[in-house]
Amino acid sequence: HQISAVVTVADDGGSSGRIRQETPVLPPGDLRMALVSLCDNSEWSLTWRDLMQLRLDTDGPLDDHALGNLLIVGLWQMFEDPVVGLDWMGRLLDSHGRVLPMSSVPLRIEATVREGDHTKRISGQTTVAVAGADLVPGPFNELAHARVAPRRAKQPPVYTQQAASVRFV
């Protein structure tokens, strides 16, 4: 059986967040993590996996970027298609499955947080995660509602084939 991982494209922190600010592409970090988790155990695949996970250590703007994120963005620019680029990276890793973005446009996580008797709206995966962790547990402090924006994000056309082959075990 072929594994298909449909992965979020809402990451806005770290290397992915910086890439999102500088280029009009999907955030590659979560997609990279899914790709390396599906790689083969051969020396070739494990070497590529380690290279994909390598964080650059520089005194410049590339500091702490995951090299794999930059490679993925390069493939996207080369092929002008994120799914094709991910398939090529999967071939380099000899992946045991396919990684697909859940949307063909970058998504944003938004939430409504209840603090005491008032609510506030927050936006961004990193902000929502931090807000949830900072809330003092209690009946009046909670993450009241979370949503993804844009609400009607376009799915890549490949999903028709993938959706038809889904089996529940």
Functional labels for PLM-detected ranges:
Residues 2-5, 72-169:
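Conserved catalytic alpha/beta core of Sir2/sirtuin-type deacylases, generalized to analogous enzyme cores
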Residues 7-80, 91-93, 98:
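Glycine-rich nucleotide/cofactor/substrate-binding loop typically near the N-terminus or early
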